[in-house]
Amino acid sequence: SADLEYRFYDGNFRRPQQGESGNNVVFDTEGGGKVKDFFAWGSFNYSRDKVKEANFNSSIIDPYRGMPYYTADTNVSNWNNQHYRLKMRVATPQFWNFLSFGLDGYYQNSVGAKQRDMRTKSVFYTIIVRPGVVLSAGKNHRFGLDFEYASVREDLEMKAVNSYVEQTYYLLSGLGMATETSGIQRFLTYNGNQVGGGLQYNYAGRMNILLDLGYSKKVEDAITTPTSPRYLGTTKDGLWSGKLMAYIPDAKKNTHFVEMNWQERKIDGIEYLQKWETDGEEGEYKVYYKSIRSTYKTQTMSLDYRYVINRGMEYSWKLGAGVKYWKQEERY
């Protein structure tokens, strides 16, 4: 299947970095099938985003991805971003009547450019690999285990086209903390790695129930480059998640769907005390002290219910309701 969409937005109810208006073009395609006894699925997504009149971001493409250490200026500017996303899934047949394996992969490459001094060109990529195994215990019970590894990197160059005027910008540390500086050029590198895993249980009888519990931990460094590396900060991002899904047919052969989700995320922002030291002709920034200076906690819980009146392999009516709880706590 393939899908082509055009979207636009406009209005004042927004965050400053989102822009007063914007538009994006999205192309999405996916397909799957069976190769011998193996199941395979894949998708490709391309989007081109134009963000107009954005403020307080002069560095990273996505300022809301959980990285508080980036640069900002007060020059309102447009951003042009492009994103390429690839997904794939492969599952094996069942071996020895109780064991099967799967592999989930994701790759994203993004390019972003700020259109006004300080002008920024940023390249972002992430790759995620998630192998898993499923153990069947009898006809009705299945147990799953998966492992996750992810790598994240973003490289960017900030540069003023008008080299005769030094641009003022700010090194952000989160929650409004910032250090004012100026210049006509700066390089930044963000490099992170993530590991995690999950446990699953499925009961398939008269009703079908799936329980999924997961945890992941990501550590990402923000560093100035390339000639004299210096830490801007480090984040330690921990994420706990849980999901319970139930598929329950009733006596009239209609269906009840219940889904509960829980997620708790904590980000520790680490800052450094550094000093430039020289040894003969060479020099480097030496770290004397580091500590957690900021914390960001987010907790979400949701409950959704749907009642489906079936009609053969389709449905004639679907009724649903849901509730969501969201709490955010940030400290510096």
Task: Please tell me what each predicted stretch does.
Residues 1-100, 126-127, 132-143, 148-150:
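Membrane-proximal, glycine/serine-rich, low-complexity loop/turn segments characteristic
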Residues 12-19, 53-59, 112-120, 156-162, ...:
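Outer-membrane beta-barrel translocator domains and adjoining extracellular loop/strand segments
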Residues 13-17, 71-76, 113-119, 182-187, ...:
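Extracellular loop and loop/strand-boundary signature of outer-membrane beta-barrel proteins
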Residues 19-23, 74-83, 121-125, 187-193, ...:
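Short sequence motifs at beta-strands and strand-loop junctions characteristic
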Residues 191-221, 235-332:
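Exposed, low-structure sequence patches enriched in small/polar residues
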Residues 56-70, 148-191, 217-234, 274-281:
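Short, flexible helix-coil linker/hinge segments at the edges of structured domains or between repeats
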Residues 2-4, 42-44, 101-105, 131, ...:
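Membrane-embedded beta-strand positions of outer-membrane beta-barrel proteins
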Residues 4-10, 46-50, 94, 105-111, ...:
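Transmembrane beta-strands of outer-membrane beta-barrel pores
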